[in-house]
Regions:
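Mid-chain, well-packed structural core segment of small domains
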Residues: 59-92
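Short amphipathic alpha helix immediately N-terminal
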Residues: 22-33
Length: 124
């Protein structure tokens, strides 16, 4: 499994883990949180490695289905990107003021409008 997949699964788990069954949560915690192998988890629950694999697959599928229906992770990621964009724009305006560079009122207004547009988009 690629690192991006692990990160995405962990993020999905953070948002939707409480919606999983107890067994799915336990298996996910041991595999992703404690970094145990399939064999170690199988021994812990007295099931086969295939059983652990299936539990992980089913849990992953459930997490992705929750995301498709609810979209909370996507909204969270969009919000983080928007906040970063707003921060950069405000930082740029502050630097211009500190350098005492004269910005035309139209430039300041345009930049503030871009920031407002980003905020409005977040509220949708």
């Amino acid at each position: 499994m690629k690192i991006d997949d692990v990160i995405q699964t962990s993020l999905l788990y953070d948002f939707y883990g409480s919606l999983l069954t107890d067994r799915q949560r336990e298996v996910m915690e041991l595999y992703y949180g404690e970094n145990l192998s399939l064999s170690e988890i199988a021994a812990e629950f007295s099931i086969s490695r295939q059983g652990v694999h299936d539990a992980l697959k089913n849990a992953g599928r459930a997490l992705h289905e929750y995301e498709q229906k609810l979209g909370l992770v996507d909204k969270f990621q969009q919000s983080r990107e928007a906040i970063g964009d707003i921060d950069e724009r405000i930082e740029g305006l502050m630097e211009d003021v500190q350098k005492q560079e004269a910005l035309a009122p139209a430039e300041v207004t345009a930049e503030l409008q871009k920031i407002k547009d980003i905020i409005d988009k977040l509220e949708e």
